[in-house]
Amino acid sequence: ASSAASDVYKRQEVWRYAKNEKLTMKQLLNEDYQGIRPAVGYPSLPDISVSFLLDKLIDMKRIGIHLTENGMMQPHASVCGLMFAHPASRYFSVGKIDEEQLMDYASRRKIDADVLRKYLAANLQP
């Protein structure tokens, strides 16, 4: 409950969105609020290498978090993701991608496709 209350405060007072949203504790716990928070490694953001980009952006070691060579966060309870405030934002699943999609993604990320294969193995079509 304390964490949920803190979340509401940040969303309304710091990030300045959903200012008039009034939710019950049950709605908060069910995540019935405006926006989404896809976490790295989950279905809508399966590429764990994104963790390395976020580390460069926010310098995780300043708060005692480091990444393993595979992108796993330590301590284990750590999590990182993206915040989208738009009221129409919805979770989705990336699903399986083919070789052409992998090559396009690798090109746009400027990363070798073989490196991305490691991070997206579960999402690659056979």
Locations of the language-model features?
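Small-residue-enriched alpha-helical segments and adjacent helix-cap loops
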Residues: 11-89, 100, 119
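Charged substrate- and nucleic-acid-binding regions of tRNA-handling and nucleotidyl-transfer enzymes
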Residues: 79, 83-126
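Single conserved hydrophobic/aromatic residue that forms the stacking wall/gate
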Residues: 1-9
